[in-house]
């Protein structure tokens, strides 16, 4: 809310005044901020108190204040390729520290291709399906969890197709 934003701005001003440092403010789902909240940030973006980074799944030209947009650079992050999603899946299955490697799972090649293809470039969707497969599949006699095509097909979640106001996704 507004009180939170006022606290962030006060801390940013303090950083700038005491240490000569600018504050980077990252706002996820910036399209959920109403016009008043976005307007509140504008003078602090203009005077350099705040470097604003906003992320949105919506078309920023419809959902973000035009004044903020005119003082911003817009970067579009494109979906990952199937090969990139496959690499992420394999890394997650094998990595014992940051992934699910401690579960001792293996994913069959056809299951890997299937999940990466159905993810449509969305790593989160693919990784959620793999995690569900690992957590719900009993270990085989060899002590490993095998993610087969059958397991993978049971773990997929229906992909939501999103459209913006112009009908483009």
Model regions and ranges:
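Conserved catalytic/switch belt of AAA+ P-loop NTPases
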Residues: 9, 13-14, 27, 31-70
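Conserved AAA+ ATPase "sensor/coupling" helix adjacent to the nucleotide-binding pocket
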Residues: 71, 87-101
